[in-house]
Every structure is written in C-alpha cells, then in structure tokens.
C-alpha cells in the first residue's frame, strides 16, 4: 500500500535527466544534437573526434558564428535557444533545433565543456557545464563542444550501451545521415585520433556517391520534380538493386532526417509491381514543403513529422518516384558507365559494293531444327488476328501485339530467317538485334555493348501488363452497383473516414456510406474487383485512409488482377519465335515502361559486355 506523498517541484537536474531519457539514448544521439547545433550556427567545416565509440569522448568543432561569452551560461540552461521567439516561429521553424534542451540534457548525463569564439572576438571563452564557470581559452572562431564519460553518473543507462564498435557504428550512421542532408559542409571524422571519414563540400549527387559509394550511385535514378510549394529531389535505386534490408533508406523533410509512414507508404506504392518478394528499395530523397505545412514538434528526438495534407504529399511522392522508375526497357544499357567496346574489325574489310543482303547467310527453306527437345507442333502466328469491327482501344486486344500495329503477322510457311530489307545497327536499339532462341525460353540478342539475354515470357508479360494498365487508365474505371449492399459493423472513426473521403472513393468506383452510427454500407465497387472480399477490401481501404490519408489499395488490387491476366496472355516457354518476332518483342520492351522487370519484380533481361565475355575466356590476360 503506497502512502500519499505531497506534490513537489522537481529539481532542475532531475528535469534535465528526464528530458535526456527522451532525447539521449546513446552516443549517436549526443552526436546528432551537437551536429545539428553546428549546422544551425552556419558552419561550413565540422570535425568530429570520438573515443571509445563516443562513450568516453565526443568532441565536435565547427567554424560557425560562435557564442558570445555572456550567452554561454544560457547555452547550457534549460529551454534557452536562439532559434525561436514565438508560436508563429515554432509553427514554421526551419532550423534543426528549436527546443533549447539538448545541451542541458547532455550536461545532466555527462561532463560537458564548451569553447567558443565569435568571428570578431579577440579570443575564445570556455564554460564548464557542471560548475557554470567561464574562463578565457584559446581557439579559432567557431565552437567546440566536448562531451566526456557519457552516463557515468547514470549507471542504469550506461549498462544498456553496447560495445565500442557497435556504438561507433551508430555514430557513423548518424554522421552519414547529416552529411547527406548538408553536402555544402565539409566533415572529418576521427576515432582514437585515426581518420575514418572525410567528405569535402560537393553537390548533392557527388555527396551521395561519396557517402554511399559508387555502387549505390551507379544503380540510382535521379529524381528532381517541383510543383508549386512542394518538391522532391534525390536518387532512388533501380528495382534490380533492391536490398534484403531497409538499411539504405534516407528521407529528409526540409533538410531534416525523418521516418515518416506517409512517405514510406507512398514509396512502397511506387515500387509495388517492380520489386521481387520482400526486397527493399534504397533511396536518398529530399522532400521540400512549406515549413508552415509540416509540424516537426511531434517527437522528442524530432524523428517524425506530421503533414497538414498528408494525402497530397502521398500522391506527389508516389507519382514522382513512379515516373522515375518508369524508364523503358533497355534504358540501363544506355545509362551504363563503361563505354561500348570498339567493334572487332577484320584486317581486310569487305568490298564497299557488297550489299547488306549478300552479307547475310542464305535463309533455309524450312526452319532449322530446334536445339531443345520439343513436341511436334505447327507454327502459329505470334500476333493474333484482329477481329473485324473490334476497336483498337478494346483492352482485350492488348493480349496480341508483339509486332507493330500495322505489321503483317508471320505465317507458318514463311522462312524463319528471312533477310530484312536493311541491316539495322544494334547501336540504334538498347536491346540490340535478336540472334536466336535458347531452349524456347530465352532470346539471345547483340547490342553495342555485347550480349543480351532476354526471358521472353517475363518480358512479354510486362509489355501486356503495362498495356492493360494504360488502357484502363485512359478511361473511367467501370463500377458495378451491388443488388444487395454489403453492410458491416465499423468503429465510429471508420464511419467518419467513409464520410470524409466519400468523393475520392467515388472517383475510384467505390461507394460506401454510413448506414448507422457504427455501420457502413458498400453500394458499388470497381467492376474488376466485384468478385472479391468486398468487406475486407473496404476495411483495408479505410485503414489506409486513416493511417496515411490516401489509399492505393484499389489500384493495387486492380493491378494484381491485370497482372494475372497478362501472365496468362503472354507467350509461353517452348514457343518457337521467328527472328522478326523476337525483334518485335525487343522493340516493344524498349517502348514499354518498367520493362526491365516482370510483374513480379524479376529481371527480364541481363547484359554481358564484350569485356565480360573476354574475361570468361581469359582474353587479354
């Protein structure tokens, strides 16, 4: 049985220690807070020195404005800051820090010393946070914050720290996040007086390359879009560079590293049908919004934000990243860093009068025997005949094309290797020109860089899938009214969501209305999804709307159905194709968005350069 204790004012030290428990978790937390102060002070060069992974010492020196000696006591006091003065400034804050409690919190759990000199000062001044004494010191213009023996006076917190190597790794992660957001600042990191990292001022793209490596930058696609007061810049990796862990995901909102579920959901939507399995995309994205339209004061460590219009942010990010990922098939071959090898030319070139057709081997009267076992079958034209009177916009007709719309389909008795009217250089096409088929599954092609191997079913599946999506996107989504509305029990907040987003849901072909204080009636659904679990779909859509203010679930469900249709409507393995049909597929891949991956996120083609092939045969070694 507890006895009642009188209410009492907490001592300042205990208040700071409680605040430190929310903000200071480990040495990396200390480093983050000090680095943010240096950035707010206008630093252009920052040096970090660590000992014991940051447990024994963290010293951060910058060349910023410096702190006048009369303000040093305020720098280590609670709730004292130069960043804001009023509520209106808090609501549109653009600085990294604004609460004025970081240094006071650090001083309550460690030994803190600050040496600072303003740019026009005669000398530096030093303050010991534990005693509050100020004394003259030597030092260049700027500020040095020295933190020693973290958590020595709080043993309960100290025992939760990991090894020095682990804590150093967390400090390095914190530094990388801040360095990526501030490419204009030079950073140097020392651990036990040994240089670990050095990044010079650079443009954002070069800083990303410096911090995350050339491999990341080589697999990344640029993003740079601005619409009114919102903009998104940075890099997102190609789906083929997806990772098993979400350890290379950096999102910055107005220069602040955050973890935001609205933007994360938007990115998952953009990558929805190009990632395989549980693979995770990698990205460095800088989202810029009006500071008054985002609340950064929602998390003790400022790791989370709240957008005024999360739905608009979700749609913007999803569309911009989706457009970046929507490169056409073979674009990677054009973006490759290594130049195409010089063609190997014979010592005696052919006479100039030699016609292109003469340079080709004569076509056999009958198709050659397949190099793989296959059952007897008659060769059918790959492009289906278009029935008379059927509109070309009929989405069902999109199962057909591999050749151009006006092309004449191949017939069974046409020679397979008929010579084209002219030799088309493989340099004109990223995926090159077809050479033949392998085991009825793969297409071999030659392009300017070397050899291309295409999974013909996966490639055609993506082509048909994108055509189906495009056909439906160009027309209003058909809806089906339900003869008997589906009524289900719902919480009051879900009923409110159904009312709030009724117009947006109606545009998607989904009509649901409250039928009581705790029930919702679904009266119409998108026609493509009418055979599914309507109640489950409605609940999932409302869950998305409540979480991020937007829902891509209807589109994802529709696309899942179209993906299945495309899979069944695509060319199957062991289907013999003519050279013309193979080239038609390659050309369609080059004209189709996201054709580098199938609908399930697997690659549709791979490239071997001539140098890669030379290495296999030890040529030039």
UniProtKB/Swiss-Prot annotation:
Task: Output the Gene3D superfamilies linked to this UniProt entry.
Answer: 3.30.230.10, Histidine kinase-like ATPase, C-terminal domain, MutL, C-terminal domain, dimerisation subdomain, MutL, C-terminal domain, regulatory subdomain
Protein keywords: DNA damage, DNA repair
Identify one Pfam family in the record: HATPase_c_3
Where do the segments described as Disordered lie?
Answer: 329-381, 403-422
Give this protein's Gene Ontology molecular function annotations.
Answer: ATP binding; ATP hydrolysis activity; ATP-dependent DNA damage sensor activity; mismatched DNA binding
InterPro entries, per database record: DNA_mismatch_repair_CS, DNA_mismatch_repair_MutL, DNA_mismatch_S5_2-like, HATPase_C_sf, MutL/Mlh/PMS, MutL/Mlh/Pms-like, MutL_C, MutL_C_dimsub
CDD domains named among the record's database cross-references: HATPase_MutL-MLH-PMS-like, MutL_Trans_MutL
* Positions with biased composition (Pro residues): 341-354, 364-374
* Annotated S-S bridges: none
GO BP annotations of the record are: mismatch repair
GO CC entries? mismatch repair complex
Summarize the protein's role. Answer: This protein is involved in the repair of mismatches in DNA. It is required for dam-dependent methyl-directed DNA mismatch repair. May act as a 'molecular matchmaker', a protein that promotes the formation of a stable complex between two or more DNA-binding proteins in an ATP-dependent manner without itself being part of a final effector complex.
| Name of the molecule in the record | DNA mismatch repair protein MutL
Where does this protein come from, organism-wise?
Bordetella avium (strain 197N)
Instruction: List the gene name.
Output: mutL
